[in-house]
């Protein structure tokens, strides 16, 4: 039996935790550089579309009294860890699926599972201020569906739905469109509806072998899961990522190569930290740059370069050298650049099989230096030690003009409580 605990409008809920005056005020959260909407509270959804550019909706926000915030990922990450820790304290095994979702193994848990779901919901809210929904079912896909129903009908469900009972499960399947099923995108929805598979129930009753032949094994597993056969296990340990990406919009348009190389060096440093954190090395790096998308008066340009590293590595010095050389090759003067991206590819574990018996490997001295770098930055803060090409305070850094305080991660911004 699986449970899915999903935070409600997570980013917006995080902003409300320390601003009780916004309890009934619609909220949107903006992407890096206050570019576009990436999160909306429930009461903001009728007025603002996901992904809407901020500069296009300022009048809408003002007209409907909607509060906007710059993204504060330090706050969101910290509150996410607190939510996950509470869930882990109440169930035997947890898979953290995303920053605001976790699957829980409820097999063999004593007592009523609906009551357990209510206890999880209550404790998370009491300890963090974050509202969550809980879906309980025999498979992961059904747990997703139960959670969706818990939120959609919250006034009737209290935010918890258990569909282990076949009759309840059948009702939910019949009253859920196929497009709302986990993993069914717009194109797949159109294909399935063309086959008269309109509801989740229709998909559960479809021939799984036919679905596999026409589409993929993924759709076959989805149908089997909806029918009650568990095909997806609980992954307690996150598998190493096969690609690692770091990209940001610049705080302002850049026209010179120097600042763009600084940005690429900075993003390479961030990506290499993630690479070393999972104990991996990479063989290739792809660097890309582009101009803005929304201004019709600006000349458009986008390009990328893929570089092969001399050997699989996680040494930020070597990676930065190759990444900055790559961006130098694709840079063209006369354009106003808005974004750069660094993508680490061909990720593997050190010492994995290679067909070249005499292939060069990363020197032990690099391993020791990178370990020391991560140890110092882990103790004294990110960026304490960095490569010389990474600036301390870049003038192209992210624009976050509406960011809330780091209430839980910075000593100088902690709340002060006075007792009288």
Question: What does each of the following model-derived ranges do?
Answer:
Residues 97-101, 137-140, 280-284, 335-339:
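Short Gly/Ser/Thr- and Asp/Glu-enriched loop/turn motifs at secondary-structure junctions
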Residues 116-179:
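Long, highly charged, low-complexity intrinsically disordered interaction regions
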Residues 104-121, 150, 196:
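Catalytic palm subdomain of template-directed nucleic-acid polymerases
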Residues 14-16, 39-42, 142-150, 216, ...:
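Short acidic, glycine/serine/threonine-rich loops at helix termini
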Residues 180, 188-334:
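DNA-contacting surface of Y-family translesion DNA polymerases
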